[in-house]
């Protein structure tokens, strides 16, 4: 039997706040703010990184790679940090060949991108 939640999925996406200018520290401080301000307790549970998080090119294996200057600890560590706060972590991808900002899209890379995100 399915249950109905009292609220729709609620969270935050980095684009409208930071646009191109995202980094590891901003995402961590946003997760901290969700907890400290009571947003998490109010039902906000998603922290989603939008466009501009990756390098401009895929690696030699065809995988998306986080921008090492913006995310020096990598996405796994950042995801673990967000999860440690009791929140859920999401990463933007695009179904086209490139994102709106010109970063690699997932077209014809869907399987490897899904694997990368899961890791």
What are these regions (language model features)?
Residues 22-23:
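Structural helix-adjacent loops and short alpha-helical linkers that scaffold large soluble proteins
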Residues 26, 30-119:
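Aromatic-lined carbohydrate-binding/catalytic grooves of carbohydrate-active enzymes
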């Amino acid at each position: 039997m399915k249950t109905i939640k009292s609220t729709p999925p609620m969270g935050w996406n980095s684009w409208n706040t930071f646009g191109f200018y995202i980094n590891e520290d901003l995402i961590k401080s946003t997760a901290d703010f969700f907890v400290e301000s009571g947003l998490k307790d109010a039902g906000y549970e998603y922290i989603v990184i939008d466009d501009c998080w990756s390098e401009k090119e895929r690696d030699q294996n065809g995988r998306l790679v986080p921008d090492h200057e913006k995310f020096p600890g990598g996405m796994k560590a950042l995801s673990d940090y967000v999860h440690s706060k009791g929140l859920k972590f999401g990463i933007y991808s695009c179904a086209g060949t490139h994102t709106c900002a010109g970063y690699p899209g997932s077209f014809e890379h869907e399987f490897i991108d899904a694997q990368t995100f899961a890791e």
